[in-house]
Amino acid sequence: MKANELREKSVEQLNEQLLELLRDQFNLRMQKATGQLGQSHLLSQVKRDIARVKTVLNQQAGK
C-alpha cells in the first residue's frame, strides 16, 4: 500500500482501512504468541501500513 493510493481515499474509507489493519495486527500478534505465525515479517508490514494510514488521516485533518 502506497501513501499516494491512500491520499485518494475519503476519510471514511481510511477509517475502515485503519480498523481492518488493527484487526489484522491483533490477529497476527495472537498467532505469534501461540507460535502459529510462520511469516513474522507481516507484523512489521501491518505496523507500517497503520502508520501510513494515520499519517494520511492527520494530513487530511490539517487541511
Swiss-Prot record:
Q: Which UniProt keywords apply?
A: Ribonucleoprotein, Ribosomal protein
The record ties this protein, via InterPro entries, to: Ribosomal_protein_uL29, Ribosomal_uL29, Ribosomal_uL29_CS, Ribosomal_uL29_sf
The protein's matches in Gene3D superfamilies, at most eight in alphabetical order, are given as: 1.10.287.310
What organism does the UniProt record list as the source?
Answer: Stutzerimonas stutzeri (strain A1501)
Similarity section:
Belongs to the universal ribosomal protein uL29 family.
Q: Which gene encodes it?
A: rpmC
Gene Ontology biological process terms in this record: translation
Under HAMAP family, the record lists:
Ribosomal_uL29
GO CC annotations?
Answer: cytosolic large ribosomal subunit
SUPFAM superfamilies xrefs: Ribosomal protein L29 (L29p)
What is this protein identified as?
A: Large ribosomal subunit protein uL29
What's one GO MF term for it? Answer: structural constituent of ribosome
PANTHER family linked to this entry: 60S RIBOSOMAL PROTEIN L35/50S RIBOSOMAL PROTEIN L29, LARGE RIBOSOMAL SUBUNIT PROTEIN UL29C
- Superkingdom assignment: Bacteria
Q: Which Pfam families match?
A: Ribosomal_L29 (PF00831)
